[in-house]
Amino acid sequence: MDKNKAVINFLLSCDYVRNSPLFYTLGQVEADNKQVVTLANDVSVNTPYIDGSVKKRYTFTLIDYQTVTPNAVITREVDNTNVPVSENLDNAFKVQQVADWVTEQSDLRRYPDFGSDCVIDDMVVVTDQPNLNGVDRAVTPVLAKYSISIRIDYIDYSKAIWK
């Protein structure tokens, strides 16, 4: 199984991702577009076992473009409580929801399908909140580039001498 396609299929099962354009490696920089970029896999993690199987790591980043405004955070009273209101806070929260969804899937042991020769041990979001990688003021509307990185550790049994 192609691991890149498996990750795309997995992400498309998340409502927030499925309802927006998703690109692989290269995409259009527009509000609400998402992009999957694979990272160089850490070969130092490759641990061969006596049966021929190998522990490996697959890491990717999900980039999410969201609109941003220079407006200050304001508060509104809701049910006798002051609640912060900000488009920027709301948009960052959208990206956080994907990170939370991935963590929830991992807790339930629902992983991308890497095929019958691979068994996923763990899937983690590398940071506890999205990274803000920059703001593009050259476009209208102004866009923020948020990202979350996800690491998948798995055992590759494709060369194992017994299974």
Identify the residue ranges that each predicted region occupies:
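Short secondary-structure junction/hinge motifs that connect adjacent elements
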Residues: F23-K34
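Charged, amphipathic alpha-helical segments and their flanking helix caps
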Residues: M1-T25, S44-K163
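Charged, often glycine-rich, active-site loop that binds/positions anionic groups
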Residues: D32-D42
